[in-house]
Swiss-Prot record:
Lineage of origin: Bacteria, Pseudomonadati, Chlamydiota, Chlamydiia, Chlamydiales
Name of the gene this protein is made from: murE
N6-carboxylysine sites (modified residues): K218
Protein name: UDP-N-acetylmuramoyl-L-alanyl-D-glutamate--2,6-diaminopimelate ligase
Cofactors demanded by this protein: Mg(2+)
Role description: Catalyzes the addition of meso-diaminopimelic acid to the nucleotide precursor UDP-N-acetylmuramoyl-L-alanyl-D-glutamate (UMAG) in the biosynthesis of bacterial cell-wall peptidoglycan.
Compartments, as annotated in UniProt: Cytoplasm
Organism, as annotated: Chlamydia abortus (strain DSM 27085 / S26/3) (Chlamydophila abortus)
């Protein structure tokens, strides 16, 4: 597509002479700009893209999109006060509105997005409707897999990834949809067919000014759904009705406690999986999932509801597939080769940590204890630090350590966490590797060790450096030294 075609009918102000030169790419990173690119000069939290516009032009940019006009740039400038929306508009048009050629499923909620998206993708694949995946752990775009650190990528990348799915002849795109992504318009011009709400608890209050603002961002996904779409909602949530009222799509509910279209009952837990009865339209189906914990029953129900309703696949077939699908990496991922069961989990919010601790405590023998290694991320919501300590204290012994401190002092974060403990039933070890080593050294064969907070991550972020760090690999390394 050439520049004149791309900018035709744009609502932005255009400065400079528009030619029919071909547009090669759209990017926010001036370091990646090449000849024929459009540079999106976004103002971020830590730097301003406008400071790099000259560099982008030197590298071959044919136009710069910004919220600020720069009279010294010798290229076309596309100026809008709503730059995120402009970026979304340009990206969708440039890549040919790829979401219109896919069944797009968006999953939002505080916890569970990764597991639900993982399950839905595999169920779609099993029903001969191959799906791509965009999420926290990775983006699967057909034969290619990308790890870029985004749960919901910026519009330029998001539309590019969707276009790759179309090119790979996929039928669907299953996406984790973050509240931040919704709030800053990254999802504009994505045509969703299905919206899923997993749950709603406190998170991202470092970005959103209040819980109500956080909830309103989540509601935005459901307001985007068409009347032909599906709104799949956890009916056990106190806010379920508000999400159903916010959409014109067909509501489909799932749950355990409240009556729902897809309801679980007679739940039986074990260390190796979960059995339950699935009730649907008066029929009862026996279900088994290798996933453990009540929170994962909700995840399984959501995935089955989406696939059954959207694809009209045979329900017994979906149940048989679920019986063979394990957890995504770093989501209650078990390691059974140690002195006791060890689990790696991404839980980094109070609610997620509570769910995981409750699940594992139920698996303990009467004289066993739960040992939890955890910390809190720096430059993130500080209000949850005390609460995380209070959660762990309910269930077992805490080993408080460093998570991703980012720009903060690790000791300061740990001190804020520890102020939440009421009893001295915890230990402090700033070095995360040493914390894991210590937890394993004090564990008996009657205990369970949970290493929480980082899950699938293979790095640790400090103020001046990011180092390689993988909780699972550290655990396996410590265990190998016992042999």
């Amino acid at each position: 597509m050439n520049l004149k075609e791309l900018l035709h009918n744009t609502k932005a102000k255009i400065y400079g002479k528009i030619s029919s030169v071909e547009v090669r790419n759209l990017t926010r990173d001036s370091r990646n700009v090449g000849v024929g690119d459009i540079f999106i000069a976004k103002q971020g939290k830590h730097c301003d893209g406008n400071d790099f516009s000259h560099l982008a032009v030197e590298n071959g940019a044919i136009a710069v999109a910004s919220s600020i006009y720069n009279p010294f740039l010798p290229v076309v400038q596309i100026i809008s006060s709503d730059l995120p929306r402009l970026e979304a508009d340009l990206a969708a048009k440039y890549y040919g509105h790829p979401s219109q050629k896919l069944c797009v499923v968006g999953i939002t909620g505080t916890n569970g997005k990764t597991t639900v998206s993982h399950l839905i993708k595999l169920l779609f694949d099993a029903c001969d409707k191959p799906a791509g995946l965009i999420g926290t752990i990775e983006h699967i775009l057909g034969n290619s897999r990308i790890q870029d650190g985004y749960t919901t990528p910026e519009s330029c990348l998001l539309q590019k990834y969707l276009a790759k799915m179309v090119k790979s002849h996929l039928s669907a795109a299953v996406m984790e949809v973050s509240s931040i992504g919704l709030a800053v318009n990254r999802l504009a011009n994505v045509d969703f067919d299905v919206g899923v709400l997993t749950n709603l608890t406190l998170d991202h209050l470092d970005f959103h000014s209040s819980f109500e603002e956080y909830k309103q961002a989540k509601l935005k996904l459901f307001s985007m759904l068409p009347s032909s779409g599906l709104a799949v909602v956890n009916n056990d949530l106190c806010d379920a009705a508000q999400f159903i009222e916010a959409t014109q799509a067909q509501p489909i509910t799932y749950g355990i406690e409240q009556h729902a279209d897809y309801q679980a009952s007679h739940v039986r837990f074990s260390p190796f999986g979960t059995d339950f009865d699935l009730l649907y339209k008066g029929e009862t189906f026996a279900c088994y999932s290798p996933l453990i914990g009540q929170h994962n029953i909700y995840n399984v129900l959501a995935a089955i509801a989406v696939t059954h309703q959207r694809l009209r696949c045979d329900l017994p077939h979906l149940i048989s597939v679920i019986a063979n699908v394990g957890a995504p990496r770093g989501r209650l991922e078990p390691i059974f080769s140690g002195p006791c069961p060890i689990y790696i989990d991404y839980a980094h919010t109070p609610d997620a940590l509570d769910n995981v601790c409750q699940t594992l405590q139920a698996l303990l023998p009467q004289d066993g204890r739960l040992i939890v290694v955890f910390g809190c991320g720096g430059d993130r919501d500080q209000s949850k630090r005390k609460i995380m300590a209070q959660v762990v204290e309910k269930y077992g012994f805490a080993v408080v350590t460093t998570d991703n401190p980012r720009g903060e002092d690790p000791e300061k974060i740990i001190n804020e966490i520890c102020s939440g403990f009421l009893k001295r039933n915890f230990s402090i070890e700033i070095d995360r590797k040493q914390a894991i080593t210590y937890a394993l050294s004090i564990a008996s064969d009657r205990d369970i060790v949970l290493v929480a907070g980082k899950g699938h991550e293979t790095y640790q972020i400090f103020k001046h450096q990011t180092i390689a760090f993988d909780d699972k690999e550290i655990v396996l390394g410590v265990l190998s030294s016992y042999v």
